[in-house]
Amino acid sequence: YTRVSEEHQAVREAVGLFDVAHMGTLEVVGPNAADFLDAATVNYVRWLEDGESQYSALLDPEGQILDDMIVYRRAWDCYFVVVNASNFDKDWAWLNAVNENRVTIDADRPWVEVTQPVTLRNLKDPASGPHQRVDLALQGPHALHVLLDCEMDAELRAALRRLPRTSFVEGQIVGADGDLVDLLISRTGYTGESIGYELYVHPDRAVTLWRTLLSAGKAYGILACGLAARDSLRIEAGLPLYEHELDGPLGISQTEAGFGAYVKYHKPFFVGRAPYKAYNDHTERQLVRFAVDERGARALRGGEHGEPVVNHRGNVIGTVTSCALVGDHQVGMALVDARYTDPGTGLFIYPEARRIAVKAPDAFEVGDRVALPVPATVLSRFPIR
């Protein structure tokens, strides 16, 4: 919408509004909904009360991550689930296959299956009618002020004022067109901001909600923000993205990504539990955040990354997974040998290793380009905000 740096700064200092309607949304309904999700996901769904949510993930029977997600408990028998857009078809097919006992969910005990199926609803499908939901994200220090400047009843206003992180409330606001907009408002987000909300709305009312929030946010310096700013914000915050810091070409697990606390081994069973635990009990890889030492330059370029990381002796110890320009310096994440994860540890990254032909030193000729390592420093895994 504007410059990525301006949108990034708006979220950190004021408020930004994101169109994330591409995210996948579904519902798990029925008296056995909690049992089903506890078997299918890594977190402990039964800990949730009405109006609470949790970060979680789907694993396959080999313990490989299929996707990460947020699970919201709307009622004891109704759970709202948000997944990555690029994985929705895969997730939907997998959950239906598990629900219908068309796949083996435990290689060591092939007889294990779902005994009490649930109802699965695709909330992106027009066939879901009034149940359809898409996501708009309102993030930044003034996000609550923007919401409270919208017209709503006293009950919803009071609920929003006291809403703790990861909880949600359902209600209505008056849209810019004068009609009511039904919402599920959760205090969640993927920008690293402590004040941030995701608003789930019927797609027919999404444009009205967008205009309503932009109008209410003018006094607070609101900016409409694109996905590039969302990416730079989550990188700065150290939040993993599927295919970059989760699974992907490096096969990164939640534990390696620093999100192992969301994997509840005390559950006697969830799909992939045994192989996941066996691998992660012995992994020697860990995700780190880093900052490039040089200021004012894009030392690392391109969106795919994969640049090799070496230690002070020149030994390859890892790979860059993401990087973004934040202010006047670059920050990123890399999967490295776990011995090099302490904050302050020096790293060296070869930014052009894949773009420059590699020769043996004795074959160098005048005019050849040689990739030089870029110094970087390990940061704390997650920033303190």
Where are these regions (language model features)?
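Acidic, proline/glycine-enriched N-terminal capping motif
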Residues: 1-55, 64
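Short amphipathic beta-strand starts and helix->beta connectors
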Residues: 4-13, 58-68, 176-186, 316-319
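Conserved, structured C-terminal
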Residues: 75-77, 82-385
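Acidic active-site catalytic centers that drive phospho-/nucleotidyl reactions
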Residues: 19, 68, 198
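Acidic/glycine-enriched edge-of-secondary-structure segments
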Residues: 50-60, 158-165
